[in-house]
Design a protein with these regions (language model features):
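Short, small/polar-rich motifs associated with maturation and membrane association
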Residues: 1-261, 275, 656, 685
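Extracellular/periplasmic, surface-exposed regions of secreted and cell-surface proteins
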Residues: 24-27, 72, 264, 268-269, ...
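Short aromatic-centered micro-motifs
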Residues: 75, 761, 789-791
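Conserved small-residue
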Residues: 131-192, 291-292, 562-570, 678-779
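Flexible loop and strand-edge segments within Gram-negative outer membrane beta-barrel domains
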Residues: 141-144, 193-233, 237-241, 252-330, ...
């Protein structure tokens, strides 16, 4: 598949990677199509940051990140822009990823970040074939931070107190005797267990395994008049949290249920006229805790001390931390139990009609297509049980371990809460429309195709006109218009030339800058088809092709960060603003006139980002197809990247926020290598596999940095979203070393032996915020690696797939102790006078550390290698009992996803985009079967 059509693989001169349904269906029980792409397409990087049911779709980038704004690729399903989440894996025939200028130029202002083409299955002429797929998945969490139990954490606190007594003699009151410590780990009875809690929050909240399941039925076939493919798919993602019975009339927790249906029909209306009709729909319901309290449910794994309180006491009272009552909200068990439930419902209906007419009677090889597509999507959030205003009315208790005194917190009022355990003190969440995800789309296009062969000369051409209209909620529609063409020439399958162009318009910009022309060219040379090479009779050489492409593509969109500049080219005015009272002496609230102020300064010169891409590559196959692969070297220059006014180098006396502008520039480069092998050892044995490596590095060249800013503080010459840190260079091992060191500009008096020595990078004689420097890598890996090995023996099939990344950094702030909670993590060895080569400094208790003493402690090497997929299956296809039962084949399989992980990270999350803590990432074990009738 290529943009707006198909080409023979041998004649393709663009950088295109492809995978098929067989590969996608063995990805270990995942229901997210995005997750199934991991490791299966060179150049494609997927990053998952949560295992929450329904939210496991990863962030996808192609050949790195070349913009600090959107890096999301364009996704087309059967030629229409649609979200990947709307497609079930069992309905996919193939996925193609277009990466270079030649492959993406026809998408104009939408193609700079790459394009993913998803083609769904279609019917073939013949009797009906029915496939039934069913699988059950057992899930468990992959990796969470290794937190100390109460005994170890409090023992560490004792050590810290000893180290800081000179600063805080009163901290001695927190020092615990060995007898007291023993009670946390070995309580004598229930009363002691509640007075000296030692809660393993992971064991308390999470099941050993959770269950998910998926079922799919599809039928395909056809006659000379009509071919059909129809599919129905149901997926359920279960909750890894334990089931909670709260006697309040609702069932809290997390889950995700999705139904997908699809019908693809191909009609041969006449010998020269075809009609293609695609109908698909999905209904998905995601269940979670209500509202903003959701993140507190999993914060236990990153922040709640094991000795703080019991999740729930024996009398049914929830635990809270009385010395600081605001921490009552951090009882994750309570947050899960009595915060209500909220349902997010997504409904989608997609339709597209394509009429194809062969015009061979006018000119051989000429045909025309007309397409009309209507999509509707609706999202409702908030429906369910709203208990968020009443959770604090539950009874709370805390037992002081020092005295054994019980403290309770009960909130009542005189209106209707006669009992603090009022089980009906919640209301029904009515739900509301999410306008950002509720939309309607209409696309229509006309396309003319030509392909013909004259002896050794093969020529092709394509011209396409498309209009798109897209509206969110009740907003004014977005509109685009595209005029696209492609011309191809192939001489004797030896020399190939291609030229693409797109003239695109977008109403996101002013009328003067609304249209632009993007184009690309590509050439190919099939060396193995040269007469001289054939004369050499190189039996080991099957195919060798060189190809190169160069061109420009655009990327429109006016969303920067969380702000949408829909009409960024226009001035925006609004009324109100009390600041005018200080200027005029008139209170606007008492004035008979409306006060207006300019809240946005427009920039009529706004335009799309422009990507200039170069790709030089080779494709090869040796030894009768046993070994094949490709190598690509690529470069990109991204210009005109949007910079919001708040980040521009504009003096404060400008008077208002500066307008958004196209001022950014980023360069990137890298390479891809893929090697595949496929060897039929005997009639029964086949060995196969593939390995791939992608390296992509980006560097900001221009970000409107202030000219007088120090070079290391500028964004220029750094990676996109570069990590920064104060750099440590060992420890203060004695007071003499500390007294002779560089002072800190804040809390300098709190430095002590055992602290990191922080590098005075700017050499100004003081550690300040200016010593925060670029360090490590960005959050996007520079290198991704994939290795897959498998074999087939008669009906048996087995494979394993490893996936890894490196040259990536991730910040995880796992702070131990700190004066309020006894949370402590296993980080290795702590500094002491007798252990001066420790892994990390000793934490603090009451003595506040100086501002910069963390150094690089919480900036982790984000590299990892994981056993991503593995499968063992057996297919029955020739057994007599199979035919007697009316079956064509039966495949039974066991597979898994995210099975093993090797990393220095404290948890299994590939990015922090979902927040500091998140629902645990899952490990899956899947058992299923596939029946073909």
């Amino acid at each position: 598949m290529v943009g707006f059509g198909q080409q023979k693989k041998a004649s393709v001169v663009g950088a295109i990677a492809q995978t098929n349904s067989k590969t996608l269906e063995r990805t270990g029980g995942v229901t997210s199509l995005g997750q199934a792409l991991t490791g299966n397409l060179p150049g494609v990087v997927t990053m998952t940051d949560t295992g929450k049911p329904g939210d496991e779709d990863p962030k996808i980038t192609i050949r790195g990140v070349t913009s600090w704004n959107s890096s999301d690729p364009l996704v087309l399903v059967d030629g229409v822009e649609r979200p990947m989440a709307s497609v079930d894996i069992n309905s996919v025939a193939s996925i193609s990823v277009l990466k270079d200028a030649s492959a993406t130029a026809v998408f104009g202002v939408r193609g700079a970040n790459g394009v993913i083409l998803i083609t769904t299955k279609r019917g073939e002429e013949g009797k009906a074939v029915i496939n039934v797929n069913a699988s059950t998945t057992l899930k468990t969490y992959s990796k969470l931070p290794d937190m100390m139990d109460a005994y170890d954490a409090l023992s560490l606190r004792n050590q810290v107190i000893e180290n800081e007594l000179a600063y805080h003699p009163d901290s001695w009151s927190y020092y615990l005797t060995q007898d007291r410590l023993h009670k946390y780990r070995h309580p004598a009875n229930q009363a002691e267990a509640e007075r000296y809690p030692n809660i393993n929050w992971v064991d308390y909240l999470l099941k050993d395994v959770a269950t998910s399941y998926n079922a799919n039925v599809n039928i395909s076939g056809g006659t000379k008049f009509v071919k059909y493919f129809a599919s129905a798919d149901f997926a359920h993602e279960g909750d890894i949290y334990k089931k909670v019975t709260n006697v309040k009339g609702y069932d809290p927790g997390f889950s995700y249920d999705r139904i997908n249906v699809r019908s693809n029909l191909d009609f041969n209306l006449t010998k020269t006229t075809k009609l293609h009709l695609n109908l698909s729909g999905s209904h998905a319901v995601k269940k979670a805790t209500q509202g903003q309290y959701e993140n507190l449910v999993w914060s236990a794994f990153y922040g709640i001390a094991p000795d703080s309180f019991m999740p729930v006491y024996s009398d049914g009272t929830f635990g809270y931390y009385q010395p600081n009552p605001t921490q009552a909200a951090t009882n994750s068990y309570e947050d899960l139990s009595v915060n209500g439930i909220g349902y997010t419902t997504d409904d989608r209906l997609n339709t597209d009609f394509t009429l194809e007419q062969d015009l061979g009677f006018l000119l051989k090889g000429l045909n025309v297509q007309a397409k009309l597509a209507f999509d509707n999507a609706f999202r409702e959030t908030g429906r369910g049980v709203d208990d968020t205003t009443d959770w604090e009315d539950e009874a709370h208790k805390w037992i002081d371990p020092e005295t054994g005194k019980e403290y309770t917190d009960i909130s009542t009022d005189a209106l209707y809460k006669f009992d603090f355990k009022n089980n009906n003190a919640w209301k029904t969440g009515a739900g509301s429309v999410n306008n950002g995800e509720t939309y309607r789309r209409m696309d229509y296009s006309v396309q003319l195709n030509y392909s013909n062969k004259f002896g050794d000369h093969t020529v092709g051409a394509m011209g396409n006109f498309t209009r798109e209209q897209y509206a969110k909620g009740s907003e004014q529609p977005f509109r685009r218009e595209n005029w696209v063409f492609r011309a191809t020439y192939d001489y004797a399958s030896r020399y190939m030339v291609e030229y693409n162009g797109a003239y695109n318009g977008s109403d996101l910009y002013s009328s003067e800058n609304r249209f632009a022309f993007f184009n690309s060219g590509a050439v190919g040379w099939m060396v193995s088809e040269e007469p001289l090479v054939k004369k050499l009779n190189l039996k080991w050489l099957d195919m060798l092709k060189f190809r190169a492409s160069y061109g420009q593509i655009g990327q429109d969109g006016l969303r920067v960060g969380n702000k949408d500049y829909r009409f960024g080219y226009m001035d925006v005015w609004s009324n109100g603003g009390n600041y005018r009272q200080s200027l005029t002496g008139v209170d606007p609230a008492k004035s008979p006139y409306k006060w207006w102020q300019q809240t946005q300064m427009g920039n009529p010169e706004l335009q799309w980002e422009v990507a200039t891409k170069l790709d030089i590559a080779a494709d090869f196959a040796f030894f009768g197809g046993v070994i094949s692969g490709s190598f690509d070297y690529f470069k990109e220059k991204r210009t005109d990247i949007l910079i919001p006014g708040t980040q521009r180098a504009i003096p404060s006396y400008f008077g208002t926020e500066a307008p958004i502008a196209n001022l950014g520039k980023v360069d990137s480069k890298g390479y891809e290598l893929e090697i595949r092998w496929n060897k039929q050892l005997t009639r029964s044995w086949r060995l196969w596999g593939n390995a791939s490596l992608t390296h992509a590095v980006s560097e900001i060249k221009e970000a409107d940095d202030p000219s007088l800013m120090s070079e290391y503080q500028k964004k220029a010459n750094k990676g996109v979203n570069q990590n920064y840190s104060y750099v440590d260079k060992g420890y203060y091992n004695s007071w003499d070393e500390l007294y002779g060191s560089t002072a800190h500009d804040e809390y300098d008096e709190n430095r002590k032996p055992g602290n990191y020595i922080i590098l005075d990078y700017d050499a100004d004689g003081m550690i300040t915020q200016d010593d925060n420097i670029p360090y490590g890598y960005t959050g996007i890996p520079q290198n991704t690696m994939n290795l897959q090995i498998g074999f087939d023996y008669k009906g048996w099939s087995c494979f394993v797939q490893f996936y890894g990344v490196n040259n990536v950094s991730r910040s995880v702030g796992l702070t131990s102790l700190g004066g309020t909670r006894n949370t402590a993590f296993f980080e290795g060895s702590y500094w002491s006078p007798d252990n001066q080569n420790a892994d990390v400094p000793l934490p603090r208790w009451l003595n506040q550390a100086s501002k910069y003493t963390d150094g690089t402690r919480f900036l982790f090497d984000g590299s990892y290698t994981r056993l991503k997929y593995a499968e063992l299956s057996y297919t029955f296809s020739k057994e007599k009992w199979l035919k007697a039962s009316g079956l064509s084949s039966l495949k039974v399989f066991v597979n898994g996803n995210n099975l093993f992980l090797w990393t220095d990270m404290p948890d299994d999350r590939e990015s922090n985009t979902g927040g500091w803590s998140a629902y645990p990432t899952q490990r899956r074990f899947n058992l299923g079967f596939k029946i073909t009738l």
